[in-house]
């Protein structure tokens, strides 16, 4: 090889190294900008992440940071269907190996959320507990509060309400340390719901009232606390107060789906006190709700009203509509169960095939060794 060719190769290698360093620096800048805008502008964070030309080319910390930030951005933009446990595991494994407790704790938290989406509840709980253990020695109180909040949700889903109440208390303590007003309100609402679930109406009302006082400064929360207070009043047969709470909740609510839920609750109280026309108006207004359970509930209560009035034909028709909506939900759940079974079958089949291939390879290797080995002297 002549000197000119050697110089050309060296120059090319230097150029490639330079371009690589420049690209690495650009990716670092993008990841830093993503981290800075994640909380307030998650849509911008997701858009910035798309500027990284070759995510699969990232290595080490850049790769882990990208995996964590993309999982966060998808979560905050409600793109649950795009979440991947293999993606967030890149971050989990890297940060844990490097001893970065803060980022490892965050990664475990988001891994838990992905497991929750997949309804793998025990895996989610294990991830949250691991996150809590790692974050204990950090000062990221907000994420610690979120971890305990989700542990509370998991316990609540399983009917362990007393445990969930204790978890939610932990979350409030951390949110107070983080001075996060919005999440403190979430904590109060969780506590109120938890106590309401175990029929401790006094405690439920105390937290709901406490949240209501603070809720004016946080959009969307006031209606939620008013609805909770309405449920408590209705449970205690304080119907005039329940009607007032539900009506006020609907008045201040700016979310259409929530407004339908509040209208359904209001209709039930009107039905209890014999104001049938008002009850019917509330139920009819909920028929077009996008939430199948709300619209099905509206048809169910209309059927019940007409049955009590002796109008059995109308009652039957409304009951049919209620049942058909629930059947759609059941079919969707059944399809999911069948798909899960099919995926499990395919995975088991693949594992079996791999085992067979491995055994066949081992047999071939054995026979090769048998026929090529020298005979004993």
Model regions and ranges:
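Residue signature of alpha-solenoid helical repeat architecture, marking inter-repeat boundaries
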Residues: 24, 61-63, 102, 142, ...
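TPR-repeat structural position
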Residues: 42, 80-81, 101, 121, ...
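Amphipathic alpha-helical segments of tetratricopeptide repeats
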Residues: 50-54, 89-94, 130-136, 170-174, ...
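Structural motif corresponding to the intra-repeat A-B loop/turn of tetratricopeptide repeats
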Residues: 77-78, 118, 158, 178, ...
